[in-house]
Amino acid sequence: MEKKTYSYDEAFNASLEYFNGDELAARVWVNKYAVKDSFGNIYEKSPVDMHWRIANEVARIEAKYPNALSSQELFDLMDHFKYIIPQGSPMTGIGNNYQIASLSNCFVIGLDGNADSYGAII
């Protein structure tokens, strides 16, 4: 089954609506995080599609363990970046069958001192 593709304008306009008119957020999402193949075909229309992709992939792994969260529960935690906020490479790579992407990223942790340093980043 062939997966639906979207034009840049379709993805941008849907993302613009998702981000309540924030053009920068919409452009960054389409340019950096929407799933694309090596030919530049766009397979996600908005961050809603991305959150479902990530939720479905995480739920697939979760199902192997007791008390697994469902795709819907995971989606609800991510939708509109509410609670779980994937960052950078993981946002592009999790569940992406079109490109190989790193799933690692840096994390900022709480510190008692100055958090504006290399020491605050793992």
Model-inferred region functions:
Residues 1-122:
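Extended catalytic cores of very large enzyme megasubunits
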